[in-house]
Amino acid sequence: MEDDSLYLGGEWQFNHFSKLTSSRPDAAFAEIQRTSLPEKSPLSSEARVDLCDDLAPVARQLAPRKKLPLSSRRPAAVGAGLQNMGNTCYENASLQCLTYTPPLANYMLSREHSQTCQRPKCCMLCTMQAHITWALHSPGHVIQPSQALAAGFHRGKQEDAHEFLMFTVDAMKKACLPGHKQVDHHSKDTTLIHQIFGGCWRSQIKCLHCHGISDTFDPYLDIALDIQAAQSVKQALEQLVKPEELNGENAYHCGLCLQRAPASKTLTLHTSAKVLILVLKRFSDVTGNKLAKNVQYPECLDMQPYMSQQNTGPLVYVLYAVLVHAGWSCHDGHYFSYVKAQEGQWYKMDDAKVTACSITSVLSQQAYVLFYIQKSEWERHSESVSRGREPRALGAEDTDRRATQGELKRDHPCLQAPELDERLVERATQESTLDHWKFPQEQNKTKPEFNVRKVEGTLPPNVLVIHQSKYKCGMKNHHPEQQSSLLNLSSTTRTDQESVNTGTLASLQGRTRRSKGKNKHSKRALLVCQ
């Protein structure tokens, strides 16, 4: 259920009009085809997970990690809005947060996966690559997400955005693994997705009888925060890592002294992810009712106090996306998101509507999912974008789309989609002064191949004259060639700068010397493009 009355204010309109296109990423890939792709990074033997000495055997089983590419082709500005296909706001809000995740977006723009993907059918990584590339290279447009993104999840009703988010992340993680079913457990923790979103919990139990210590390490892709008694994300994190006393019926059975003894259990972050997904537990597991309370969250978050190793410096994260639910239950309401473009401007992504907003508006929401990225990672990717090439000229994607379509269809089955509807792409127009208009006319006047009386050069071939000009009063119906001659004569003052775009209405306003000052109230010619 989409409730427009629940929308929050504080933003100003960014796009004055939306351009709806079909689900085809050709225009986005056209730009990538015209530029050289970054070389694949060599395999790195460095393990970013700082494992303890007792975990050295496990570390040797981990697959070598690939360095995530830094793409110089990622646009700095905001991309497209997403069309709501009916109770799909949860999908749109989640996809926008993933689209503006810098490490994931840059990897997708490199097309590294689709060039080596061996899966006979569509995989989530290939599908997400097409979506992210297309969305980031379609500013001012409204695009329709591929149905393959929610295949097996969407059932035609409102779903939980966090569940869909983790469904997509898990599907991308599985797409990174080999095709065979038997995969080593530790190999799952070295995939591209785990490099971006993954970290490691450290659960430490200390026996208060023999002072023995037992450590358990578990991977994670997101962190759920209990906000029942917390007024801020910082308080929720402090409660999460607060030591827990195990005694009485919950006494710990120590493996060293072989006794049931009181113990202390502490949960900390052993390694923190590049991208941190914090989920505020707002919905009841039983009833689905929402805990509608304001929980403060900062623009910059220091995660060092919650790490197992306290001897290092600050570990600062910056906020780049917020997923919001407006409503009273997980079964209804409306989802939208806020994202931070690489240029630093925040935008509200509400299905097809894209509006610029302030950081004050972003921090005042009843957030459901928070997306943080390490400050060093954000600065590294921002520097990469700032060194990128200059923006393309308007309309360049339309020129090269047809030339690249054949090559795109050979890349991977997931990248194939219906054709773009050319009628829905608007052309840019440029204003011109009278002096600017006269100058090219004088330059072109001496060229013999240019015929100013030839109307075909300035009017589209599918023009139908509804109202004839004022010269028709002196004609007879059996002289069509005379009508055509006068129509050509009336077009002498029109130039290519005033050519009529397909799908618009135009009127011939030029007058010949013979009719100057006469018949001021006669009808002008009205043209319709079919």
Curated annotation (Swiss-Prot):
Short name of one Pfam family: UCH
SUPFAM superfamilies, sorted: Cysteine proteinases
Start and end residues of each stretch annotated as Mediates interaction with SUDS3: 399-530
Catalytic residue list: C89 (nucleophile), H334 (proton acceptor)
Miscellaneous: Overexpressed in a subset of human breast cancers, overexpression leading to an abnormally high level of CDC25A, which arrests cells through replication stress or premature mitosis, the latter occurring when CDK1 is activated inappropriately.
Function: Deubiquitinating enzyme that removes conjugated ubiquitin from specific proteins to regulate different cellular processes. Regulates cell proliferation by deubiquitinating and inhibiting RCE1 thereby controlling the small GTPases NRAS and HRAS localization and activation. In parallel, mediates deubiquitination of CDC25A, preventing CDC25A degradation by the proteasome during the G1/S and G2/M phases promoting cell-cycle progression. Also regulates cell proliferation and apoptosis through deubiquitination of SUDS3 a regulator of histone deacetylation.
Protein name: Ubiquitin carboxyl-terminal hydrolase 17
